[in-house]
Structure formats: structure tokens, C-alpha cells
């Protein structure tokens, strides 16, 4: 149940951003749609990477220390295709990130390696 709720929440954020906020900005400003970049740090980085699986709008996506340890995110990426095949992607995670937390954060380096490999495989 939590998995569906979390996925629905991420989808709502992307829907709000790409279906409501972006069109509103485009109606007010001259925006080059070939230069839309979506990125973030920590949970924002996870959301940006998640968007690769949900929309092809951003021309580039970046994640700095993305929270790829988030429950079921690695499985989500394994089970779903990247939709945004043309995006430039930049991922940056520390190799010792979270290792002294003694909880789910301990898995951060391994999860990051898996996400990096999955995206690399799907985009090449």
C-alpha cells in the first residue's frame, strides 16, 4: 500500500510541475522547450530521476546525492522503462554516503550504483 501511495505522490508532483506549472510559465515567458532542465539534491534528485520514467519533457536531468535508497526505488527502476531516451543525464553520489547511519541509509552507495547502472544501460 505504501509503495502505491509513494508512487502516486511522485506522479502528482511531476503532473503538477509538467502539466500545470510549466504551461503557466510558458504562457508568461518565452521558454526554449529544448532547454528545460530538471534536477535536485537528495529527494529532489530522486524526483528528477523519477521523471525520466514518466515524461520526455526535460532535455536534461541531474541528481546530486539522490535519495536512491528510498524504499522500492531501485525495483521501480528495474521494472520500468526510461521514457525520456533523449535526455542528457548527470548523476553524482558519494561512495561513502550514509554508511554510518546504521539504517536504510547504509544502503545508499549500493543503491546509487544500481541506479547509475540501470540508467546507463537503458539510455545506451
Where does each model-flagged region fall?
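Non-catalytic cap/lid and distal C-terminal segments of serine-dependent acyl enzymes
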Residues: 1-124
Amino acid at each position: 500500500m505504501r509503495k502505491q501511495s509513494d508512487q502516486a505522490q511522485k506522479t502528482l508532483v511531476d503532473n503538477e510541475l509538467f502539466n500545470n506549472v510549466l504551461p503557466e510559465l510558458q504562457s508568461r515567458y518565452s521558454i526554449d522547450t529544448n532547454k528545460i532542465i530538471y534536477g535536485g539534491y537528495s529527494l529532489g534528485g530522486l524526483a528528477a530521476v523519477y521523471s525520466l520514467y514518466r515524461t520526455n519533457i526535460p532535455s536534461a536531468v541531474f541528481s546530486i546525492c539522490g535519495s536512491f535508497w528510498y524504499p522500492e526505488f531501485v525495483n521501480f527502476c528495474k521494472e520500468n522503462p526510461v521514457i525520456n531516451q533523449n535526455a542528457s543525464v548527470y548523476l553524482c553520489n558519494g561512495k561513502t554516503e550514509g554508511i554510518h547511519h546504521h539504517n536504510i541509509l547504509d544502503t545508499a552507495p549500493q543503491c546509487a550504483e544500481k541506479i547509475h547502472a540501470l540508467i546507463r544501460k537503458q539510455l545506451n
